[in-house]
């Protein structure tokens, strides 16, 4: 891809995200979402492979439908109440339409169908953008409108996302699809708590971005697209694979790693809200995710599949140290002890 075109796309992504996050008017928020959609499409289809082109078309159609729903819900609300302010979403029909639109944008169940397919059709770096930066504008809109949304609908979608994200990830062999279902499950946890404690949702989202970025960058460094490649990547970068294993366990939410903090706090908040049954169900559903994260972590260690005698092993080659991955891996593993400081800052 032309470096100038790539630079323009990345600047447009940042611009669209900033416009949506900082706007109070529905039209400006919608404009930011549209800029984002149009900026990411060249990055998805940059390889010109049929799978990439198919992914970009799917992404465009789904996001266009979601944007139309955002515009329709805001116009319905303005027609009924005369308000164009994002925080004044008081009309019930507009509220339901917006919930559906944001669920499509984020890839929440039952609107998750497009997300694994699009991630599978693109490169690891673009998949990283789709899983992190592209989730920020819809999440910001969800945070601003959360007091007006229906708690029952959001809780149902959150539980379904946590269940399906864990269940569908069990039989996947492609790392991008596994991370797509991981993203769906994590978004379920965030949606669950957004009405009761929006700041906790934001903290969970930031930590999710941190851990997901670490995993994607590590996989990109070792060029790992399938589990079979992950099995043989230890010989290429043993230290990186050890750090990747810790990050995957952190994503699973195992103590004493960073990923345990948001899950622990969310379960605590749900219990405070007297939603003990929901807290129990979502905690049990996280075991599904734990299984495939453990499987990934097991494959990332020194696990070689059965090979013929003439199989060419990927021997260790000394690579220059990647400082950014080292910093991200450290943060993904050791932030739990300072959780009281993080909570005090919220």
Curated annotation (Swiss-Prot):
InterPro entries: Complex_I_Subunit_2 (IPR050175), NADH_DH_su2_C (IPR010933), NADH_UbQ_OxRdtase_chain2 (IPR003917), ND/Mrp_TM (IPR001750). The keyword Transmembrane helix applies. Its main location: mitochondrion. One of its GO terms (cellular component) is mitochondrial inner membrane. Pfam families: NADH_dehy_S2_C (PF06444), Proton_antipo_M (PF00361). One of its GO terms (biological process) is mitochondrial electron transport, NADH to ubiquinone. Its EC number is 7.1.1.2. The chain crosses the membrane at residues 1-21, 25-45, 60-80, 96-116, 124-144, 149-169, 178-198, 200-220, 242-262, 274-294, 325-345. GO terms for molecular function: NADH dehydrogenase (ubiquinone) activity. It is found in: Mitochondrion inner membrane. It is a multi-pass membrane protein. Disulfide bonds: none annotated. Keywords: Electron transport, Membrane, Mitochondrion, Mitochondrion inner membrane, NAD, Respiratory chain, Translocase, Transmembrane, Transmembrane helix, Transport, Ubiquinone. The keyword NAD applies. It catalyses: a ubiquinone + NADH + 5 H(+)(in) = a ubiquinol + NAD(+) + 4 H(+)(out). Belongs to the complex I subunit 2 family. Core subunit of the mitochondrial membrane respiratory chain NADH dehydrogenase (Complex I) that is believed to belong to the minimal assembly required for catalysis. Complex I functions in the transfer of electrons from NADH to the respiratory chain. The immediate electron acceptor for the enzyme is believed to be ubiquinone. This is NADH-ubiquinone oxidoreductase chain 2.
């Amino acid at each position: 891809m032309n470096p100038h075109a790539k630079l323009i796309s990345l600047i447009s992504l940042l611009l669209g995200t900033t416009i949506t996050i900082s706007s109070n008017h529905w039209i400006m928020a919608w404009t930011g979402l549209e800029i984002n959609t149009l900026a990411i499409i060249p990055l998805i289809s940059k390889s010109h492979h049929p799978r990439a082109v198919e992914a970009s078309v799917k992404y465009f159609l789904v996001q266009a439908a979601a944007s139309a729903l955002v515009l329709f819900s805001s116009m319905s609300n303005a027609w009924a109440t005369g308000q164009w302010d994002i925080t004044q979403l008081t009309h019930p029909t507009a509220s339901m339409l917006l919930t559906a639109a944001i669920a499509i944008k984020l890839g929440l169940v039952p609107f998750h169908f497009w997300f694994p397919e699009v991630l599978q059709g693109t490169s690891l770096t673009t998949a990283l953008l789709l899983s992190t930066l592209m989730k920020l504008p819809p999440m910001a809109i969800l945070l601003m409108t959360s007091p007006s949304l229906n708690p029952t609908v959001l809780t149902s979608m959150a539980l379904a996302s946590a269940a399906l994200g864990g269940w569908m990830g069990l039989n996947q062999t492609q790392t991008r699809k596994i991370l797509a279902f991981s993203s769906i499950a994590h978004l379920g946890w965030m949606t669950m708590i957004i009405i009761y404690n929006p700041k906790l949702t934001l903290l969970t989202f930031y930590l999710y971005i941190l851990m997901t970025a670490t995993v994607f960058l590590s996989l990109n460094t070792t060029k790992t697209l399938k589990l079979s490649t992950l099995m043989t990547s230890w010989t290429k970068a043993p230290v990186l694979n050890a750090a990747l294993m810790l990050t995957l366990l952190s994503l699973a939410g195992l103590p004493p790693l960073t990923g345990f903090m948001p899950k622990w706090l969310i379960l605590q908040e749900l219990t405070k809200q007297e939603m003990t049954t929901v807290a129990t169900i979502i905690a049990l559903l996280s075991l599904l995710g734990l299984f495939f994260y453990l499987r990934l972590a097991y494959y990332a260690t020194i696990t070689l599949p059965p090979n013929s005698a003439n199989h060419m092993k990927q021997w260790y080659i000394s690579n220059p140290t990647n400082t950014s991955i080292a910093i991200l891996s450290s943060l993904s593993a050791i932030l739990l002890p300072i959780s009281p400081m993080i909570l005090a800052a919220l």
